[in-house]
Amino acid sequence: MYRRKRSSKSQKKPGKEWVSYFYIDATGKQISLGTDLDHARIKWAELEAKEKPKDLRLMKAIFDRYERDIIPKKGPRTQKDNLSEIRQLRPTFDTAPIDALTPTMIAQYRDARSAKVRANREIATLSHVFNMAREWGLTAKENPCQGVRKNKETPRDYYANDAVWSVVYRKATPELKDAMDLAYLTGQRPADVLVMRRDDIEGGFLVVQQNKTHKKLRIMLTTEGVDNSLGLLIKQMAARNAEHPSQYLIVSARGKRMSASMLRNRWDDARDLAKVEALAEGDTLLATRIGQFQFRDIRPKAASEIKDIEDASLLLGHTKGDITERVYRRVGAIAKPSK
């Protein structure tokens, strides 16, 4: 295998160099191995009918390649989660050859982790890393994560009733109230609520593309030609923020787009004030419930308070009603008394 350098003659990129790798077969024919050295080494080994280089078959090199080539193509939150998961996996698996991984090793890792839910996420990421390594030709083994039992997970079942909602809402700043109302009426995730814009309003709909699933929704702003609750809210927000040039629906008092940290700070302040008020009135149970209330609980609150499960699933962007029912509906079924 040899490499060839080529310099750019472009005025836009003067002095830039490209490196390509080539294989010369028995007839003297040049076969391109690409521009990536690791890829070139693998192709060279295949052409020579030799074992793949050992260093490329260690999990450290495979994790490195996954971080370089795969993670950047994912959404921002998934990138952050995957990097954290791989960072946790590395001390255990970095020095292991990929072909040495077994279901028993994966199960032992699962059992050794004190954070049981995080262990499930880490093993899921490891499984995808292994599948990519198969595609890259670094192993022909079956995925060792397949068939390994996951730790049991209990979906969060907190429900913010009206008593909790009203006291936190009273303590909220105007922009936090807007965020709470918008999250409740649209049923969307906090990250999606914060990026809603005035120019997302098209033809009587608020157009939403969910960041997590890329699902597209058009949420109605009118019902039978009359503004519904969401339509009225957006008009009120637009009127209140008319002096600010920002296109975002939720902005601070100074007209700046509400960031996740700004939302978190305002939420913590309002919740703390609400908790103090409940304790001052001697209602420790309400204070505890207020302390457990997270902004993300607004989405399941919205789902729980829509009577029709199909309507709730549609608003949340779910393709299957059982996901909505199992994870997001947090109030019990209505039952009649015995008499």
Where are these regions (language model features)?
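N-terminal core-binding DNA-recognition domain of tyrosine site-specific recombinases/integrases
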Residues: S32, R68-M132, L138, R257-M262, ...
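Short basic/aromatic active-site micro-motif
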Residues: L101, A260, A280-K307, I323
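DNA/chromatin major-groove-contacting recognition/catalytic segments
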Residues: V164-V167, L217-T223, S229-K235, L314, ...
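Short, polar N-cap/turn motifs at the start of nucleic acid-interacting alpha helices
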Residues: D200-G203, D308-Y328
